[in-house]
Amino acid sequence: MSEPFPIRFDLVTFDTPSTEVLAAFWSEVMGLTESEREDGDRWIVLSDNQGIRRLGFQRGTHRPGGTHLDLVCSLDQFDAERVRLLALQATETRPVRRESYGMIANFVDLDGNAFDLCAYR
């Protein structure tokens, strides 16, 4: 039997000049609560009540790039979740598309980080 892989995934971290603003946005999007905070607002971590889903926000230079998050919901929740994201001030970057696998909407958050809302068949 082999040893477990020594590296494990911990959290996704956003570099942002506005940790509290971006953490509040993602808290509403994902239903996560603040679980860690260091040096005022330099470092904030959100997590679910089991500590499994975690997002980090560290004060730093904002560098949106080619990486994005895929958020998944059911097809019957897709329209309502899309409206909720827009109400939270996410910006839709392309029209909603129907694909072979289901529906997709492309967004950026308040700092310009890309994420998709997907609903699979």
Q: Where do the model's predicted regions map?
A:
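Eukaryotic phosphotyrosine signaling hubs
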Residues: 9, 64-69
